[in-house]
Amino acid sequence: AGKFLSREIMDLISTYALVSHPVDSKDLWPEQCLIWETAEPYLYIRTTRGNRIIVGGEDEKFSDPERRDALLRKKTLVLEKKFRRLFPSIPFKTEMAWCGTFSTTKDGLPFIGNCPDKDRMFFDLGYGGNGITFSMIGAQIICKKLQGIDDERGRIFGYERIEKYW
């Protein structure tokens, strides 16, 4: 997308996550709710249907895939340590870890709609950590736009705010 815009409007963030081997349900926390620690860097913990635990976070602002991948083992150990600090009684063993890159914007909202000066080019990007929600909203907005229907949410996520924040 950067090739079509007049300036950089997003930061690329490297992120890390792991999933445990299955854990006995009696060992899990009540309600198995999503846990989000808002420290910097943030930490999130949730369970899966098969009683596995997903731990993620340790984000860093850079986009070099080789550097990101080289940090995977170190970041996995940090995530494991943070989990064990919060839940020392839960038997926890990592089965798999992964990393990736996502983009975020200065105001935390994605850009959805036409590319400036290119009426037939649409973007839906910059979700931050909210890709499931924002990609669905983006698909709805763009689908309506292609049908000639105005979606008022498009004004919230439009490129017009570039001048305001960037």
Where do the language-model regions lie?
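Active-site substrate-recognition segment that forms the wall
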Residues: A1-D119
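C-terminal lid/capping helical subdomain adjacent to the catalytic/cofactor pocket in oxidative enzymes
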Residues: P116-W166
